[in-house]
Amino acid sequence: MQLLTRANVSSSPSRRPESNALKQKCHGHSNADNSLSRSKSDVAIELTNVSKSYGDKVVVDQLSFTITSGECFGLLGPNGAGKSTVSRLVLGLAPPDEGTITVLGEPVPARARLARSRIGVVPQFDTLDREFTARENLLVFGRYFGLHTRELEEAIPPLLDFARLESKADVPVAQLSGGMQRRLTLACALINDPQLLILDEPTTGLDPHARHLIWERLRSLLALGKTILLTTHFMEEADRLCDRLCVIEHGRKIVEGRPHALIDEQIGCDVIEIYGGNPRELTSVVGPYAQRVEVSGETLFCYSSDPEQVRLQLRGRTGLRLLQRPPNLEDVFLRLTGREMKD
């Protein structure tokens, strides 16, 4: 078992390791284009034309994507888009109705148990035993994977160190903060030294400091060559962590690509948010100077490559508040899935 130590887990990794398949250096959001050929050993997860229905409801519809070993791949979509079902399919907890799934070289669900032995899962809601200490929870998770006492004695201290919980090792989970509990859940997912991590909303409910600490820990895992499948509603999280991402709705893939490339392709200009006026009326004023305008409640979103002209048209109007900013991944997500509320 490879142990996580201060020597091989950098607290501030400068870049991802080089991929053998890519034969190039990877910086920031750069990664191989999905069209490049990969050897089987370089593919962590592959879904090909996968469909899944429950009764008359199609939850996953002819979905295909490939995740390269060592990358963070984001799966984004509104509530009910099918993200949780995709995770269950990848883990072999539900069989597909159509299509094929390969995880870490194993056909799923036929050899799902073998694949799962090399996977760590961080669920949306913690499954920690609140009466047990941090150390005892790690012991319990280790037993699930059949690890012996000696192996656990070697593995647990570095994991507590990784999660920055060394001083809380013998404190009951109920007495830990939300951020500490989330880091402990991540440590539990690493107890079997997995090649692949599946993360479901890993920072939901955390304050900004705790969230950034989780992100820093996840980046250190990527620097070690771990593969991550991330489902999240938090667009900043996807932008910071993901090499590539896929947006799905009603179980179908809408778009796939690198975060910054998708922002350029789907938005490509500044965004001006306009508050305090009648958005329908203002649309006719700024519309001729915008590539696109959208109304959400009492807010007008103006997408323009000439934002100064938009500001000029609104000059002198009282009661208006303008926020000009560069486009972000949330703009892409809302453009593709709509701004209306979804349950």
Curated annotation (Swiss-Prot):
For this protein, the record's PROSITE patterns field holds: ABC_TRANSPORTER_1 (PS00211), ABC_TRANSPORTER_2 (PS50893), NODI (PS51240)
| Boundaries of every ABC transporter domain copy | 45-275
Which Enzyme Commission numbers does its entry carry? 7.6.2.-
Residue pairs linked by disulfide bridges in the UniProt entry: none
Q: Which Pfam families match?
A: ABC_tran
Any one Gene Ontology cellular component term annotated for this protein: plasma membrane
Question: Can you name this protein?
Answer: Nod factor export ATP-binding protein I
Question: What is the organism of origin for this protein?
Answer: Sinorhizobium fredii (strain NBRC 101917 / NGR234)
